[in-house]
Design a protein with these regions (language model features):
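Aromatic "clamp/platform" in nucleotide-sugar-dependent glycosyltransferases that forms part
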Residues: 166
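Short hydrophobic beta-strand element within catalytic cores of glycosyltransferases
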Residues: 183-186
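Nucleotide-activated donor-binding/catalytic signature segment of Leloir-type glycosyltransferases, i.e.
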Residues: 129-146
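A short, well-ordered alpha-helix in the C-terminal region of glycosyltransferases
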Residues: 212, 219, 226-241, 247, ...
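Donor nucleotide-sugar binding/catalytic pocket of nucleotide-sugar-dependent glycosyltransferases
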Residues: 7-13, 17, 29-72
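Short alpha-helical donor nucleotide-sugar binding micro-motif in glycosyltransferases
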Residues: 145-146, 153-158
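Conserved acidic donor-binding segment of nucleotide-sugar-dependent glycosyltransferases
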Residues: 197-199, 203-210, 219-224
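A conserved mid-protein helix/loop that constitutes part of the nucleotide-sugar donor-binding site
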Residues: 83, 87-106, 116, 123-127, ...
């Protein structure tokens, strides 16, 4: 009986466009169209589902940062210093880690006090360390995987965030970096495209060219007032859009509309 059927919503957390090319969309559509609604992390994902014949309502949502993660962080500490560039996440080629090193190498030749910190572990870590050693690049630090307060300290000690991943859904690490007031330098991938404001939040581009990102970062390194302005904007924006309590409340309000039908 239809009254016995459970109302179901679907949250699609990742999306592989290459896989989608050869997927069984007849089967996928038949099942997804049974859902009351679907949540995805970017407008591109939503557009692809619609193009493939999904008729259920599709809503954009976000990954989230736990409210407690930023407890004790004082935004006033961001005074425009630009010395430590940070990357966090899996150490894999597809995360743009080599491009990150090359971007830093370009900048390091001009700004001698710059440092680069990699937070994370992955299959590419030994090769990346060897790459840095072979190129004789100084002041690159690898922390390995960190959690909790140790991870939080790295965000606090960083000044800029460089994330050149090839593909993404909605990278939580970028949202975390924003909450901690870091200017973001990243690529047009996944859900970042839907909200990122070039100039106000840092820099976003489709490019994978390290020279492009090095050039984009120079005005920030040389202008403490610009760094400070972006730090404040990013932290406030992220607190009002990406902390768990905000994301969950919006999620619940959307679902309530369907429950009340």
């Amino acid at each position: 009986r239809s009254s016995d059927l459970k109302k179901t919503s679907v949250f699609i957390h990742g999306f592989n466009f290459e896989y989608a090319k050869n997927a069984d969309w007849k089967w996928i559509s038949a099942n997804l169209n049974k859902a009351l609604c679907i949540f995805v992390l970017s407008q591109d994902f939503k557009n692809e589902l619609i193009r493939r014949g999904i008729k259920s309502d599709i809503h954009l949502t976000s990954t989230k940062v736990p409210d407690y993660f930023i407890s004790g962080f004082d935004l006033s500490m961001r005074q425009g210093k630009a010395e430590n560039i940070m990357y966090s996440g899996r150490i894999e080629k597809a995360k743009g880690v080599y491009e990150t090193v090359d971007t830093f190498s370009i900048l390091k030749s001009q700004y001698k006090d710059l440092t680069l910190t990699f937070v994370g572990d992955g299959s590419e870590l030994p090769m990346l360390k060897q790459y840095v050693e072979n190129k004789k690049i100084k002041d690159v630090r690898f922390t390995g995987e960190l959690r909790g307060e140790d991870f939080k300290k790295e965000y606090i000690n960083a000044d800029m965030y460089l994330f050149l991943s090839y593909t993404e859904g909605m990278p939580t690490v970028v949202l975390e970096a924003m909450i901690f007031g870091l200017p973001i330098f990243t690529r047009k991938v996944g859900g970042l495209i839907d909200f990122f404001e070039n100039g106000k939040m840092g820099y976003i581009s489709s490019s994978l060219d390290p020279a492009v990102f090095a050039e984009a970062m120079k005005p920030y390194i040389e202008n403490p007032a610009k760094m400070r302005s972006v730090s404040i904007y990013n932290s406030e924006y992220a607190k009002t859009h990406f902390v768990a309590s905000v994301v969950v409340r919006k999620f619940e309000n959307t679902l309530k509309k369907y429950i009340e039908l």
